[in-house]
């Protein structure tokens, strides 16, 4: 392969693009030309109008010739694009940009050193009925030993689907640019090359297993297919959510069987003829506390009938969780407290406050 400096000065291997879409960056242009061969340099230069200028230099004359074979009257046409391409073979090499980015240099440069990455877990909306699927369990240190936790995946949500699909499209483009071979620490996150053109975000959960944090599946760990996750893909939380069943108190005898119970619950979700639904009632630390049901079948009630736990529905519990929207609505309603100068009214108010304090002490709140 030619060196990056050779590629820069290689005669008759450069192209000038006059109408790069304004929303494109270097990598968009790179992926158009890498179909025809090895790209040495690729640069998009912003312009004040709706289009940008682009500069591409292929790594060999043969690679450049493949580009020329696909030009039609100076146009490179493909899915959803039509680029006006000037061939440096015809106009000379003087237009080669000195500020071009070396793709080969980017590919060969080691990633910036940083600490291990841990993606944030996905929060579910309060008091909202959503469609979900119970997926493979993602172990977490967030759950106490006596808390029965599940991992669920939100489904049939167009807005969420669009966000994650867009992220994975960018990740799959990134997969073409880096060499994968990194040691992931157990309990931390990275990306996994599933196929030559597809990567997925993962967490290493054991010496031999990875967890697909956006799909809810466990796969085998292969060091040669792993890479530290780029910072740009760390901002979106995992698509799976860590959940507990609200209102359940478990017997000591049931706790060692949590793994088996999780398997039964996952099969229950898969066997139901209708879609599972979840409503988040509140939060316990980093855990979404949910009611999980399918039609008239409520999971917590089914487990209670097995005699392995006690179930206290949310409306019977002493504490309540209110949604952020409800609190904002109340705050914005313009209701303000008026201070009274009447001594008797103030004394009565203080008595009520003392009564509330006593009640809270009795409830150990």
Curated annotation (Swiss-Prot):
Coiled-coil regions listed in the entry: none
GO biological process, one term: embryo development ending in birth or egg hatching
A GO molecular function held by the record: mRNA binding
Keywords recorded for this protein, A-Z: Cell cycle, Cell division, Developmental protein, RNA-binding
Domain of life where this protein originates: Eukaryota
Keyword Cell cycle in record: yes
RRM domain location: 13-90
Disulfide-bond pairs as recorded: none
GO terms for cellular component: cytoplasm; nucleus; perinuclear region of cytoplasm; ribonucleoprotein complex; RNA cap binding complex
Annotated function: Required maternally for early embryonic cell divisions. May have a role in DNA replication.
Protein name stated in the entry: Embryonic developmental protein tofu-6
Organism the protein comes from: Caenorhabditis briggsae
Gene name per UniProt: tofu-6
């Amino acid at each position: 392969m030619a060196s990056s400096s050779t590629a820069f000065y290689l005669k008759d291997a450069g192209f000038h693009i006059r109408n790069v879409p304004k929303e494109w960056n270097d990598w968009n242009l790179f992926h158009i030309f890498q179909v025809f061969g090895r790209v040495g340099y690729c640069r998009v230069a912003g312009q004040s109008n709706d289009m940008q200028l682009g500069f591409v230099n292929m790594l060999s004359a043969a690679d450049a010739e493949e580009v020329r074979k696909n030009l039609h009257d100076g146009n490179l046409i493909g899915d959803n694009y039509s680029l006006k391409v000037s061939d440096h073979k015809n106009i000379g090499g003087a237009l080669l940009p000195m500020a071009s980015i070396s793709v080969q240099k980017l590919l060969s440069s080691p990633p910036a050193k940083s600490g291990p990455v841990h993606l944030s877990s996905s929060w579910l909306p309060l008091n909202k009925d959503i469609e979900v699927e119970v997926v493979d369990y993602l172990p977490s240190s967030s759950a106490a030993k006596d808390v029965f936790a599940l991992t669920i995946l939100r489904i049939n949500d167009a807005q969420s689907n669009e966000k994650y699909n867009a992220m994975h499209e960018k990740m799959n483009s990134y997969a073409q640019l880096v060499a994968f071979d990194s040691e992931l620490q157990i309990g931390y996150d990275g990306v996994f090359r599933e196929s030559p053109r597809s990567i997925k975000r993962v967490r290493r959960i054991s010496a031999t297993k990875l967890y697909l944090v956006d799909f809810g599946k466990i796969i085998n760990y292969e060091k040669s297919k792993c890479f530290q996750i780029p910072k740009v893909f760390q901002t979106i939380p995992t698509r799976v959510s860590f959940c507990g069943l609200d209102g359940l108190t478990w017997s000591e005898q049931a706790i060692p069987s949590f793994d088996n119970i999780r398997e039964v619950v996952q099969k229950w979700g898969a066997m139901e003829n209708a879609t599972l639904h979840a409503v988040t009632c509140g939060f316990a630390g980093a855990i979404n506390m949910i009611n999980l049901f399918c039609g008239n079948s409520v999971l917590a009630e089914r487990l209670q009938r097995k005699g392995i736990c006690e179930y206290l529905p949310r409306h019977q519990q002493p504490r309540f969780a209110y949604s952020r929207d409800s609190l904002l609505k109340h705050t914005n309603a313009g209701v303000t407290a008026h201070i009274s100068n009447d001594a008797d009214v103030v004394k009565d108010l203080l008595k009520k406050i003392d009564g509330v304090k006593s009640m809270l002490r009795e409830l150990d709140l």
